[in-house]
């Protein structure tokens, strides 16, 4: 069954029931409806040594579509363009372009020696979007994101160029991935001030093992209309249960980074092993697999619009698609939160009891109807931010 029947008259209640097993959120303040689980395509192709072959990629695509998924994440970089090409072919073969929501990204350079074939300048963005459209076999991209901050290009140039792409009809919505919060804030302010297409999405790493975005990006997203798309919700497979502190052999691609000095791949830490241990206990009590519990936790955190699934086998994607079929009870969620919590960095560590007591004069301040920021409470001479 496809997402939509070619003949509307043939679209029965059974079809609707099947589709509605997946729920959808609007992406940020946009009107774009996306499934809460997105299909990542970085694993489409074996060019990088650990992905899925074409038949497996197609099977994962089909399973995702049959479950009601409509959101596909890709990038020009992924497997040297194979991911975009295969995704475009799979969508076309099933006639799903009108219902599929395609997100792609630019920034990375695939032309050694050509400095303008990468980065976030206007020249590269214009080049990259045309190349992606050609590989995808479509005339528009639903969501086009800056892949990573290049530390050089002004936000004004990026947002003006992305707005031009929207006005040209090549792009519907725009987003940012892997940027500093201050840069995202400036980009959104520029869009609002100048009437450009606003940032509808932030694509960021988030998991029980990586919670840094909670201090700035989550508040930014919820207050300024940018839905968060989560990548690496299983911490590169660490939270799947396949890795242990001491193990023989190669359990997965993360093993290749055991001795890496790159902070993004330093997953084998004492803190993370403690998280894995607690996750395993909670999953056992729920009668669920560790990946499903880890995905459920991420998907139900504040500000999260969608979670990107990155699988290499059909069995993995089928298991992942069941991640939202249950709820994590408050007590078990508290245990996961406690095991994975990290000390607040400055200045958030400064906004504590003594400071708030001086700010509020010992009163309870900020209590508003549901939907507003949590109130700042003062109890006696101490103060804190309500968790309600």
Located regions from the model:
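N-terminal binding-site loop/beta-alpha segment at the start of enzyme catalytic domains
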Residues: 6-7, 11-100, 167, 379-388
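Terminal-tail/helix-coil boundary detector
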Residues: 17, 22, 247-281, 285, ...
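Conserved, mostly hydrophobic/aromatic
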Residues: 27, 39, 57, 72, ...
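Generic structural signal for well-ordered alpha-helices
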Residues: 61, 84, 88, 129-133, ...
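Glycine-rich beta-alpha junction loops
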Residues: 106-108, 180, 205-210, 232-240, ...
């Amino acid at each position: 069954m496809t997402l939509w029947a070619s003949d509307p008259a043939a679209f029965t209640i059974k079809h609707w029931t099947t589709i509605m097993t997946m729920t959808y959120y609007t992406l940020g303040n946009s009107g774009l409806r996306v499934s809460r689980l997105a299909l990542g395509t970085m694993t489409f192709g074996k060019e990088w040594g650990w992905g899925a072959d074409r038949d497996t990629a197609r099977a994962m695509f089909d399973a995702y579509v049959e479950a009601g998924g409509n959101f596909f994440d890709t990038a020009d970089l992924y497997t040297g363009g194979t991911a975009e090409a295969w995704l475009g072919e799979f969508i076309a073969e099933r006639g799903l372009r009108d219902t599929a929501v395609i997100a792609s990204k630019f920034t990375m350079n695939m032309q050694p020696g050509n400095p303008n074939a990468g980065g976030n300048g206007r020249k590269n963005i214009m080049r990259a979007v045309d190349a992606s459209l050609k590989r995808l076999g479509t005339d528009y991209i639903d969501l086009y994101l800056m892949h990573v901050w290049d530390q050089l290009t002004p936000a004004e140039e990026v947002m003006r160029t992305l707005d031009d792409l929207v006005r040209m009809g090549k792009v519907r919505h725009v987003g940012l991935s892997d940027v500093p919060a201050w840069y995202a804030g400036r980009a959104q302010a520029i869009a609002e001030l100048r009437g450009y297409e606003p940032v509808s999405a932030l694509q960021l790493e988030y998991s029980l093992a990586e919670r840094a975005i909670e201090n700035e990006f989550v508040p930014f997203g919820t207050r300024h209309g940018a839905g968060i798309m989560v990548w690496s919700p299983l911490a590169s497979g660490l939270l799947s249960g396949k890795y242990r502190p001491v193990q023989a052999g190669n359990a997965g691609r993360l093993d290749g980074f055991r001795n890496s000095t790159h902070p993004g791949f330093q997953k084998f830490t004492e803190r993370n092993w403690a998280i894995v241990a607690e996750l395993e206990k909670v999953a056992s009590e729920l009668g669920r697999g560790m990946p499903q519990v880890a995905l459920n936790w991420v998907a139900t955190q504040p500000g999260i619009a969608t979670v990107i699934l990155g699988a290499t086998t059909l069995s993995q994607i089928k298991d992942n698609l069941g991640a939202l079929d249950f709820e994590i009870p408050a007590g078990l969620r508290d245990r996961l939160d406690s095991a994975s919590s990290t000390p607040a960095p400055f200045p958030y560590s400064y906004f504590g009891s003594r400071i708030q007591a001086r700010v509020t004069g010992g009163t309870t301040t900020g209590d508003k109807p549901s939907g507003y920021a949590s109130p700042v409470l003062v109890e006696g001479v101490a103060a804190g931010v309500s968790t309600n």
